[in-house]
A protein has these predicted regions:
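Beta-strand/loop edge motif enriched in small/polar residues
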Residues: 1-330
Length: 334
């Protein structure tokens, strides 16, 4: 415990962690942390501040347990194989994630416990380390992206955002099912605005289906779900309100599975999903009016003769649709 301040230092060549912290307050600034298995390793109910540091040639740049109260700015990782802030475990307080030159890397389950809120600010990049990595929400998730500064949820193998985080150039490429899901448990709330969610959706169990699996309350706006596994959104319970969002390149775009679920989707683009854009297996009606289905003729469904757009299945309101009386276009996301 206590307070440690490290400034203008070089810490290198440690077999385990260059800096290891289990409690207290630690501030590291203007330093180089290099050539160690883990540049830093911080756990427990600690307070950690990282500003203006360079991580170089560590296997893992920074290993940070989710219980740590962590703030940071202007840090870089020049080499190594896990070039970000690797985070896992239980978020036990209201937590703020902000952008940096290094992404957050979720490894395993990251749990937002009931009564706590994880807020993610514009420009933050979250990469998931492997197919058993997920964001497991029992409290509240607020994603506050902006039109020109979105929040990304993507694969560790995705070099298009935040660069080559796993340090292997093009040896691995991102693909569907690289990570699990954003799971909303009963009583959880997610307000997701201006986010890109891709390459997730891995699961062997229906309780985790979808890049977003909703048993709580989901408000999804101005976002894009694309290139995830079998399902973009799989809803088992609760409510979803979706607006101005692209849902494409899944096997099924949206699935509403039970009678305890309610879902609306408007002003969105639902297209290029392999089987159906929306499947409603519940007795409730899905209000999916004023959406773009990939063609002026509207969705493909028996009640819409001549419809050539994305197919839908079940009790779904789809008329009017974008393109019915206007030029062939997708909605503008704002």
């Amino acid at each position: 415990a206590g307070t440690s301040i490290i400034d203008k230092s070089i810490i290198d060549n440690y077999t385990q962690a260059g800096i290891q912290v289990g409690a207290g307050n630690t501030t590291i600034s203007n330093s180089t942390i290099a050539s160690s298995t883990r540049g830093i390793s911080v756990s427990g109910n600690s307070n950690l501040t990282l500003n203006n540091n360079t991580f170089a040639n560590n296997i893992i740049a920074a290993d940070i347990y989710a219980t740590v109260n962590f703030t940071h700015s202007n840090n870089t990782s020049e080499s190594g194989t896990v070039r970000g802030f690797r985070i896992w475990g239980d978020i036990i307080r209201n937590t703020l994630w902000t952008p940096d030159n290094m992404p957050y890397i979720v490894s395993g389950y990251l749990n937002v416990s009931a009564g706590n809120t994880l807020t993610i600010k514009p420009g933050a990049i979250i990469k998931f380390a492997h197919f058993q990595s997920m964001l497991n929400v029992s409290g509240t998730l607020n994603v506050e992206g902006e039109k020109e500064n979105k929040v990304y949820f993507t694969s560790l193998k995705d070099d298009e955002v935040a660069g080559d985080t796993n340090g292997n150039s093009n040896a691995t490429l991102p693909a569907k099912n690289d990570w699990l899901s954003i799971l909303l448990n009963p009583g959880a709330t997610a307000n997701i605005d201006n986010a890109i969610i891709k390459y997730g959706g891995y699961t062997q169990y229906y309780t985790y289906y979808g890049a977003i699996n909703n048993k709580g309350n989901l408000n999804l706006t101005n976002s894009e779900l694309t290139k995830n596994g079998a399902y973009g959104i799989y809803q088992l319970a609760g409510r979803s309100n979706i607006d101005k969002t692209i849902i494409s390149e899944h096997y099924l775009g949206i699935v509403l599975s039970t009678g305890s679920s309610f879902l609306t989707v408007h002003n969105s683009s639902i297209f290029n999903n392999i089987s159906h854009g929306i499947v409603n297996l519940s007795p409730n009606i899905i209000d999916a009016t004023n959406n773009w289905w990939g063609d002026n003729s509207g969705p493909t469904t028996p009640s819409n003769l001549g419809g050539k757009g994305q197919s839908i299945y079940g009790n779904i309101l789809y008329d009017p649709w974008i393109g019915k009386t206007s030029p062939n276009r997708a909605p503008i996301l704002s």
